[in-house]
């Protein structure tokens, strides 16, 4: 789903895997230099995660399926406190595969702060408070993907009010709805039995914007 969102906006996509540092690295027996990363990738499960993501993006059609360019850990380069795979531009998309080590929230905050990301897309975590913490602490908009079936016809529930963030949410939702052909329901909720002009105006404005995008 993340690749579909990125394609809808013509945006650069970064796939980030955060995991603990393998015990072999703590023991000093393995170095993550480029020449040893491929040799010792068996010790680093994050490499397998990035490999899976790479081939999933190819099989979905997001990346051009070129047989001569495969997933090669030798193309991992160290940058500050992360490792990034350099992919050939011939894949037809601007994409980074990034490996970070540490606590997931801390590392994602660092990643979002070091690069100019607009949206962070995360899966529904089994951790009870993980999604809530990410929504609270990441300095980007956050899209939580939960129990997605790519073969299902989805509908977007676009929640609006009179806050300043509503306009951005409407524009974002409209682009996704148009590119993915998703129907949209606009909803606003009032704390009282009457809807003030702010809430009513927000709903009308959202509906008008969606109609203009059809």
Where are these regions (language model features)?
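Residue-level "edge-of-site" marker
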Residues: 19, 70, 125, 148, ...
